[in-house]
UniProtKB/Swiss-Prot annotation:
Similarity section: Belongs to the complex I subunit 4L family.
Annotated protein name in UniProt: NADH-ubiquinone oxidoreductase chain 4L
InterPro entries: NADH_UbQ_OxRdtase_chain4L/K, NUOK/Mnh_C1-like
Gene that produces this protein: MT-ND4L
Subunit architecture: Core subunit of respiratory chain NADH dehydrogenase (Complex I) which is composed of 45 different subunits.
Gene3D superfamilies named among the record's database cross-references: 1.10.287.3510
GO annotation, biological process: ATP synthesis coupled electron transport
Listed PANTHER family: NADH-UBIQUINONE OXIDOREDUCTASE CHAIN 4L, NADH-UBIQUINONE OXIDOREDUCTASE SUBUNIT ND4L
Residues with N-formylmethionine modification: 1
C-alpha cells in the first residue's frame, strides 16, 4: 500500500475520531464530516484513476454532490439552532421535540 493511500486513510480516521470525540459543538461535527467526505472523494478518485475503471468515473462526482447537499443542510441546521438557542451546543438539543 502506497504512502498516499495510507495518508488518506489516516485523514479519514482522524476525522472520524474527531467526530466521535468532539461532539459538543455542531460546527466541529460538521467540519469533521467534511473532512471525512473529502478523504473519501480523494480515495475514490485515486482508486478509479489507478485501476482505469472507466465505468465508475461518475462515482466521485456523485459523492461530491452528496457532500454539497450535506454541507448545505448542516449549515442551515446550524443557523436555525444558533438563532433559536443562541449557541451551537449539541447537548442542548432534543431531537424528539418539534
Amino acid at each position: 500500500m502506497s504512502m498516499v493511500y495510507m495518508n488518506i486513510m489516516m485523514a479519514f480516521t482522524v476525522s472520524l475520531v474527531g467526530l466521535l470525540m468532539y461532539r459538543s459543538h455542531l460546527m466541529s461535527s460538521l467540519l469533521c464530516l467534511e473532512g471525512m467526505m473529502l478523504s473519501l472523494f480523494v480515495m475514490a478518485a485515486l482508486t478509479i484513476l489507478n485501476s482505469h475503471f472507466t465505468l465508475a468515473s461518475m462515482m466521485p462526482i456523485i459523492l461530491l454532490v452528496f457532500a454539497a447537499c450535506e454541507a448545505a443542510l448542516g449549515l442551515s441546521l446550524l443557523v436555525m439552532v444558533s438563532n433559536t438557542y443562541g449557541t451551537d451546543y449539541v447537548q442542548n438539543l432534543n431531537l424528539l421535540q418539534c
